[in-house]
Amino acid sequence: MSFQLNKAQQMALHDPLLSLTERERKHLQHSWAEPFSKKIFPYITEDRFSVLYSANPASRPNNPVNIYFGLLILREIFNQSDEEALNSLLFDIRYQYALHTTSFAEQPVSKNSLTNFRAAVYRYNQKHGIDLIQQEIEAQAKGFSKLLKIDGKTIRMDSLMVSSSCRKLSRLEIIYSTVSRFIKAIDKNTLPERFQAYLEENHYNDTIYRSRDEDLNGKIKKVLKDGLRLCHLYRKNKKIKQSEEFKLLSRMLKEQQGKSAKKIAPHSLQNPTDPDATYRKKGKKKHIGYTANLIEKFDDKNQMIEGYDLQKNTYSDQKFAEDTIKRLAEGTTTLVDGAYYSEEIAKKAEAKGIKMVPTNLVGGGKNSNADQFEIDEKEHLVIKCPSGHKPIHSTFKKGSYRAHFDKKHCSHCPLRKDCSAIKQKKSYLFRISEKTLHRCQLITKMGTSQYQELARKRAGIEGIPSALRRRYKIDHLPVRGVIRVKVYLGFKISAINCKRLIKGLANRHNLELSTLLCDHLLSLFSFQRTYQVKFAA
């Protein structure tokens, strides 16, 4: 199938729009379909997806990519299934108007079109490591930001856990399911007699459920032993060795063999039906699945999600912060919570001219008066204490400052109660690491009203994870695996952005009308006042 741009967007003589009454046309133009048709659909970049199709122009041309992409956005906006979205396109003129298909004799989407399009994107990502959906949605967000005049000088970030749709398994279930899947995938004629029992209908229930607690460790050892024998038996078979089932079996044995339950790593296999899902405990909640990161640019009136990512849930917020710093422009202010922040990350950001503003710090925000000591960080010397006394001597070694102060100054100092200097035999010792000093300085800075006013602006992004869960059902997706889940996440992000654009344009239009009306009224009143003054004279 060859790639072809969608050029058939002109109205035909038989276009159903021409048969609408004035009232129907007015309602259509005041619906969501109008801004989607004029401000969203025309800016979908079809060329980006040409790599999914054949370069041979003699082959059958593709159906319009921008219609697939636009319909997938509408599917998320209205929380529909593929079938419901297709039916809406077939019978709802608003969908056809939004996607410029009113003049088509047949709507160019069939039962499996959306599934096949997503599958093509998955395969391309697996082969080349390029997410075409993410590229398009992030480019789309930049265009929307320009339309709403969001400068993007200030951004905020937040992350959320995304649950896998796979079932939570016990350790025995993980081991058994992996071994059983491998056995069912190979040729039954080559399977040794001792493993034939795994093919029996009741073998799973007999192994997993019909057992006492004291039998559990024995069963785990037995199934692991069976898995190890299978691995040794088929490891020289090149075809089987390349299969997904053999790779999962090898991975499971490496992660589970010879280890107690407490020593199993969080990144270990949680369910063979979703190899990408990992385990993480965040706060008091346990999660199996992935973690998503959101980057939002905003101003006082509008917001736009300009970037996103999805990884296994063992991926930390600090890694997301490092990834984000690489893509941000100089002069950007980034509002984050404490999980994203570290001194090393702040230094990387500063080197690029990016300002990191944490709203809190991991481990709490308790402070001493250490930052009130005057310290020359270039010369690495403690100059004087908060009371103005110079140290007897000062050193800097292995990233820490050490300064000794005279007892006669410290013993009766009015600041002694809050001072971090430690009483010793001959002097008072002030000791602080460079990292702790910078933390104290930051905590003091975080207490200022100017800093708090800026930090409060981060709260606006915290509603997005809730919306993704409640409205967009991000924890109940029909697919598994990072690549597939990320595609669904991308269209949900695009749906949020499109709704924000439509709302933002409507608000701006209303504001412009209000301004025009106000100016008109002012001109009338101004004329009346001038006339009255002349008449009085």
What are these regions (language model features)?
Residues 1-57:
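Basic, low-complexity segments
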Residues 25, 41, 62-63, 283-284:
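Short secondary-structure boundary/capping segments within folded domains
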Residues 36, 52-67, 74-133, 144, ...:
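Trp/Phe/Arg-rich N-terminal binding region typifying the photolyase-homology
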Residues 84, 103, 107, 115-537:
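Anion-binding and metal-coordination hotspots
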